[in-house]
Amino acid sequence: MTGDQFAQLRSELDWTQQEVAAQLGVTRFTVSRWEGQEEVPRMAELALRYLARDLHAELMAHDGP
């Protein structure tokens, strides 16, 4: 995942860099640095995808009857 793709996913989740940083246990500066890189560290990518999946599941549960 490129830094641009990471930033796009973060944006689609409607999260700020600070919110992602808090969820991943890193600084906002680290998230900013990742977004400027050609390739995001694999663990950061997996963590963000996991958070996105959790958020999606939570939203789907609230859309039920």
Regions found by a protein language model. Give the residues of each.
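Residues in the recognition helix of alpha-helical DNA-binding motifs
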Residues: 9, 23, 34
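Short intrinsically disordered terminal tails
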Residues: 1, 60-65
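Acidic-residue sensor for enzyme active/binding pockets
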Residues: 17-19, 35, 45
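Recognition helix of helix-turn-helix/homeodomain-like DNA-binding domains
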Residues: 26-40
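Short alpha-helical DNA-recognition segment
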Residues: 14-30
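A short, Lys/Arg-rich alpha-helix, primarily the initiator
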Residues: 1-12
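DNA major-groove recognition helix of helix-turn-helix/homeodomain DNA-binding modules
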Residues: 40-62
